Amino acid sequence: MLKYIGRRLVYMIITLFVIVTVTFFLMQAAPGGPFSGEKKLPPEIEANLNAHYGLDKPLFVQYVSYLKSVAMWDFGPSFKYKGQSVNDLISSGFPVSFTLGAEAILLALALGVLFGVIAALYHNKWQDYTVAILTIFGISVPSFIMAAVLQYVFSMKLGLFPVAGWDSWAYTFLPSIALASMPMAFIARLSRSSMIEVLNSDYIRTAKAKGLSRPAVTVRHAIRNALLPVVTYMGPMAAQVLTGSFIIETIFGIPGLGAHFVNSITNRDYTVIMGVTVFFSVILLLCVLIVDVLYGIIDPRIKLSKAKKGA
């Protein structure tokens, strides 16, 4: 397992190098510059700003300098947020995005598995059909549409939750539901199909023949094996939640990394765009690695196959 993790860490470093390189040159190829905008600066001032930030140097020199900075976990200064570096923006925005993302992931896992298990236990009954309708709705409706519907119903009409902002737990409820709706629907479908397959397996029939009650069979034997596809989906789910947070944070006025990223695109703040992209890439790669390790812990067959490959 340690050899496997070591190899994955090496692959992560190579992947990050490619991401940093591609992101850097894409930003350089973008039309305009960080100081181009509706209000054009005098040429002298723009030249001084370019010299101050090292943007007047040859492209390869800028690239090598940026690689060295990223290797030291320094993403440079922000062009638009005065007196703040990209690291400062990440430090202030990530706890907010992490809180929202963690709440959405936990909500998606809890409700998705619950609905999937209920649908499997009551296969081809009204409970199963109800869950099917809910999952179709969750998969079909984009998160930003869900956000607008939740704001209209629960904030503007019923007045149960605030429309936007980030001051207390009440402000997290609607955005976390909007962010969790699609992954929750996928998890419910995965759990249902996997649970039905497990419930029809031989060892479940043997457990029932031994006189074990239905709850005991479900909790002790069925759910653990049925959760394997859900664990596999956790990596893509993390990516889905992170990318979805860009729009959700903007809609709900949440001061997280997603909102900073969207604002940086509008403001041509290239260092923030590159820094947040690299930071999110690190988070996603770590999530995928953790999911792979968890999968090996849950399913010993995977652990054995990895050990054989590493030998």
From Swiss-Prot:
UniProt induction comment: Positively regulated by TnrA under nitrogen-limited conditions.
GO cellular component: membrane raft; plasma membrane
Keyword Protein transport applies: yes
Cellular location(s): Cell membrane; Membrane raft
GO biological process, one term: establishment of competence for transformation
Inactivation phenotype: Inactivation of the gene results in a sporulation-defective phenotype. Disruption confers resistance to bialaphos.
Annotated transmembrane regions: 9-29, 100-120, 130-150, 168-188, 226-248, 278-298
One Gene Ontology MF term: peptidoglycan peptide transmembrane transporter activity
Membrane topology: Multi-pass membrane protein
Protein function: Part of the ABC transporter complex OppABCDF involved in the uptake of oligopeptides. Probably responsible for the translocation of the substrate across the membrane. Required for sporulation and genetic competence.
Family affiliation: Belongs to the binding-protein-dependent transport system permease family. OppBC subfamily.
Protein name per UniProt: Oligopeptide transport system permease protein OppB
Species of provenance: Bacillus subtilis (strain 168)
Gene: oppB
